[in-house]
Amino acid sequence: MPKRKVSSAEGAAKEEPKRRSARLSAKPPAKVEAKPKKAAAKDKSSDKKVQTKGKRGAKGKQAEVANQETKEDLPAENGETKTEESPASDEAGEKEAKSD
């Protein structure tokens, strides 16, 4: 396979090959990092729309957390009622009655 002929003057002038388009060879403009301005009234409504999109349906771990929260609010299974606080108050009342 023959080697390419490269003259030193021609190689230094052209950094990129000819087959590359102007769109690809053009360097992207430098990004200016400006501080975001406070949202106007119109922008706030669009922010609310974005938040509602996130509330459509929980996926993965988020769904598990949501399910646990709802289960805590519901009464116990098989018709049992939650009696976490009432036994403690009954015991305290019995102890006071015994000490009298």
From Swiss-Prot:
Phosphoserine (modified residue): where? 8, 21, 25, 86, 89, 99
Protein name as catalogued: Non-histone chromosomal protein HMG-14
Q: What is the protein's known function? A: Binds to the inner side of the nucleosomal DNA thus altering the interaction between the DNA and the histone octamer. May be involved in the process which maintains transcribable genes in a unique chromatin conformation. Inhibits the phosphorylation of nucleosomal histones H3 and H2A by RPS6KA5/MSK1 and RPS6KA3/RSK2.
The domain of life is Eukaryota
UniProt xrefs under InterPro entries? HMGN_fam
- Per the similarity annotation, which family is this? Belongs to the HMGN family.
Name its species: Homo sapiens
User: Modified residue Phosphothreonine is at which positions?
Assistant: 81
Subunit info here reads: Interacts with transcriptional regulator SEHBP.
Region of interest: Disordered? 1-100
Q: Name one Pfam family in it.
A: HMG14_17
PROSITE patterns for this protein: HMG14_17 (PS00355)
- Tell me the residues on which N6-acetyllysine occurs: 14, 27, 82
